[in-house]
Swiss-Prot record:
Keywords: Cell inner membrane, Cell membrane, Membrane, Transferase, Transmembrane, Transmembrane helix. It comes from Escherichia coli O6:K15:H31 (strain 536 / UPEC). This is Phosphoglycerol transferase I. One of its GO terms (molecular function) is phosphatidylglycerol-membrane-oligosaccharide glycerophosphotransferase activity. The lineage of its organism: Bacteria, Pseudomonadati, Pseudomonadota, Gammaproteobacteria, Enterobacterales. Transfers a phosphoglycerol residue from phosphatidylglycerol to the membrane-bound nascent glucan backbones. The gene is mdoB. Gene3D superfamilies: Alkaline Phosphatase, subunit A.
Length: 763
């Protein structure tokens, strides 16, 4: 209803101004600005809904102030360009319509009416309401009834008798299981769901809408609200340290807790969360690569579901035979947006919908088959009678190729339980949410029927039943939940541990690198993650007078304030204000102690603008003083004009990447010497080893031969044509996820470059 009212007010404003208001520059500018704001808000809502499926939420608020990086971003470039072009076209058309009667006399009454209608259209728009609610949630002090509803359970289960297998299906929401809408999409897992306790109305709340947030909600009974973006939680050393979560209770009750997934455990701080709450045995892509049958059988995120669930079955067998009490949690990945992945062992590799193949539906059909196979193995084993199996989605599906079909349905998360000790077949339509999952499992295992804000759906009343406005209520509790982190409110002294790559202050510990905004009564940590902007880009968003402490590799801040450290990969500490004074200190001891020293100086806006502009320089445009190209730092020597075909810096150097260019090209500002030696320190990847690698300067070509280990080779070149470009052509680039950023498309690696130096020869 509000959408129609908002649009009607917008249309009325446009028509009244265009046909009645007449000519006046000020009224035209004011009306166009407000109407333009309406357009921007609604396009933002449309774009946000495209990515999140939930309108403008916390994730969008974070993304709007940081870079959009991570898995599948290239899939959204065209829609993004379309939105920008559409916005420009709408603004142009709007301006043209409003000025149609610019030659008529100005009418104050109609101009005022048009402006008021435009303001009303903005106020009535769902986008404005969502943003207003988000802003309020950032500034609230909390809700006084939080302590009445947040309940800590007993730390132990009195007499535990059952083992637990808990399967998180990535984005595997219950909507997929509607056989009338999606025929024969989930037959195997759907049949198992119908054999157990099926909870059909599990809604998604704010702070539970991505993987680590869904895990926290289901195990701790609280949404993941933090003083930083949730997926950046890999930088903290402990996770809700004061809270009692399901894993803590299981461990205290004698359970050995295991977690198995195909992706890297460090992503989004899953390792930190699980270790903080009772899990001592964790297996991710790094831990599994020496165990699995085929370590090269991987997708963009890690190992395929069939591999992961095979390892989970082996672990279930091993633990069951040992006779010890255990819980085994596992997380799939093949159904990750935007397209999903198809395991090679499943029979259901293709699913057509709406008359054409659909990759996301195909991935769902394949993954559910793999999960069902795993469950059926457990059911057929002699240990099933002592086991409770839980299957749940971590969150609703995000924007994938099935998303527009899902949105036509009443969407709910998946949660069902199969009991080996006491078979129960029932569909329970009680209103509930993800936070109730842990409490329900705890109740089944013989513990309390509450956990944080979660309540057992078998013997308690969910917050979703108590509060009709549960989404708004959850946001009202956000400050209370953030306070559970027990974050420090001041930073005066700090310690950096180079061996552990950690910084400690006021009782808290964080992984490096780290950026901190320090005010009188608040310390705001801004970690770096796969989905956040680099810290220097985040620092560029600081106000001129904001106090900051920035701990990072020296070369990243050297271009601003310490050019002598431009090639150093050691840790450095910078602090100050972007519009005032800044200092850079080299961390030169294993345990380095520092103090904050913020001076109340006069703000220089020219200095501020210069600092911001420098911070925003992209890596490939950075230049440093050096007589060689050093590949383990960002940028290039001052003599280099541009380069291509080279991946990002890593601790040892950089790989060539044929996804960015078939050849490595380094173009210098001036012609290379007439005679010179090219000293190359490098290694080869895969089949590029021990093969001639063409290296060209102008018309001359030399062959470079490298092994899999780093070596230094000198090639002799004559350059009679004054060529200014060096070209290296890896013969067989290999597509691989080795060393890749989690969730990014595979790189095509050829050679790994450590240093390239041009040495002029006499004569």
């Amino acid at each position: 209803m509000s959408e129609l009212l908002s649009f009607a007010l917008f249309l009325a404003s446009v028509l009244i101004y265009a046909w009645k208001a007449g000519r006046n520059t000020w009224w035209f500018a004011a009306t166009l600005t407000v109407l333009g704001l309406f357009v921007v808000l609604n396009i933002t809502l449309f774009a946000s809904d495209y990515f999140t499926g939930d309108g403008i939420n916390d994730a969008v608020l974070y993304t709007l102030t940081n870079s959009l990086t991570g898995a599948g971003v290239s899939k959204y470039i065209l829609p993004g360009i379309g939105i920008v072009l559409g916005l420009a076209a709408v603004f142009g058309a709007l301006g043209w319509i409003l000025r149609r009667r610019r030659h008529h006399p100005h009418h104050f009454g109609y101009s005022l009416l048009a402006l008021l209608l435009a303001l009303g259209s903005v106020d009535a728009s769902p986008a404005f309401r969502q943003i207003t609610e988000l802003v309020k949630s950032q500034s609230r002090d909390g809700d006084p009834d939080f302590t009445a509803y947040y309940k800590e359970p007993s730390k132990t289960i009195p007499d535990p008798k059952l083992n637990l297998v808990y399967i998180y299906g990535e984005s595997l929401e219950r909507t997929y299981f509607d056989n009338e809408v999606f025929p024969d999409l989930t037959p195997e897992l759907g049949a198992l769901k119908n054999e157990g306790l099926d909870f059909s109305h599990t809604q998604q709340l704010p702070g539970t809408d991505y993987t680590i947030a869904g895990m926290v909600a289901s195990q701790c009974g609280i949404p993941l609200f933090a003083p930083f973006e949730g997926n950046a939680s890999a930088s903290v050393s402990s996770f809700f340290p004061q809270n009692i979560c399901l894993g803590d209770i299981l461990k205290n009750s004698g359970y050995q807790n295991y977690f198995v997934q195909g992706a890297n455990l460090r992503f989004a701080g899953k390792d930190v969360f699980l270790k903080s709450h009772g899990f001592d045995h964790l297996y991710g892509s790094e831990e599994l690569k020496s165990v699995v049958a085929d370590p090269h059988y991987r997708n963009d995120w890690g190992f395929y579901d069939d591999t992961v669930l095979d390892e989970a079955w082996k672990k279930f067998e091993e633990l069951s035979r040992s006779g010890q009490r255990f819980s085994l949690f596992t997380l799939t990945v093949d159904t990750h947006h935007p397209d999903g992945f198809i395991s090679r062992t499943c029979n259901r590799k293709k699913y057509d919908f709406d008359g054409k193949p659909n990759q996301s539906f195909s991935a769902v059909s394949c993954s559910q088959e793999n999960i069902a196979t795993f469950i059926n193995k457990i059911k057929a084993s002699p240990w099933f009678k002592d086991t409770v199996i839980v299957v749940s989605s971590d969150h609703l599906a995000m924007n994938n190729t099935a998303w527009k079909y899902l949105n036509k349905q009443d969407r709910n998360n998946l949660f069902f339980v199969i009991r080996g000790d006491k078979p129960q077949q029932e569909t329970l339509a009680v209103k509930r949410n993800t936070m109730d999952n842990g409490a329900t499992v705890l109740d089944i295992l013989g513990g309390d029927n509450y956990l944080g804000l979660g309540r057992s759906s078998l013997s308690g009343q969910s917050m979703s039943e108590i509060f009709l406005n549960i989404k708004e209520k959850t946001l009202a509790w956000k400050p209370d939940i953030i306070r559970l982190w027990k974050f420090p409110k001041e930073m005066k002294e700090f310690t950096i541990d180079q061996q552990k790559n950690m910084i400690a202050f006021s009782g808290s510990h964080f992984r490096l690198p780290l950026l901190l905004r320090v005010s009188d009564k608040r310390v705001e940590p801004l970690p770096e993650s796969e989905y956040s902007a680099p810290l220097r880009f985040q620092l560029a968003d600081f106000a001129p007078r904001d106090n900051f402490v920035w701990v990072d590799r020296c070369y990243k801040m050297a271009q601003l304030w310490a050019p002598e450290l431009a090639l150093s990969t050691d840790w450095c500490v910078s602090q100050g204000q972007l519009g005032g004074q800044q200092i850079v200190q080299h961390v030169d001891k294993a345990i380095w102690k520092g103090k904050t020293a913020f001076k109340d100086t006069v703000i220089d806006m020219a200095r501020y603008k210069g600092n911001v502009d420098t911070l925003k320089i992209v890596d490939n445009d950075i230049r440093y003083k050096a007589d060689s190209f050093i590949f383990n730092v960002a940028g290039a020597p001052e003599e280099v004009k541009q380069f291509s075909g080279i991946s990002r810096p890593e601790s040892w150097g950089r790989w060539s990447n044929a996804q960015l260019g078939d050849e490595v090209k380094i173009e210098y500002k001036h012609p290379l010497p007439k005679k010179f030696d090219l000293v190359i320190t490098a290694k080869a990847y895969g089949n590029n080893a021990s093969r001639p690698i063409p290296v060209r300067v102008g018309n001359e070509e030399q062959a470079l031969v490298l092994g899999n280990e780093v070596t230094t080779t000198t090639l002799h070149f004559d350059n009679p044509t004054d060529a200014d470009t060096l070209v290296i052509v890896p013969p067989e680039p290999v597509s691989t996820n080795e060393g890749n950023i989690l969730g990014h498309s595979p790189r095509k690696l050829g050679i790994g470059m450590v240093e390239i130096k041009v040495v002029e020869r006499e004569g």
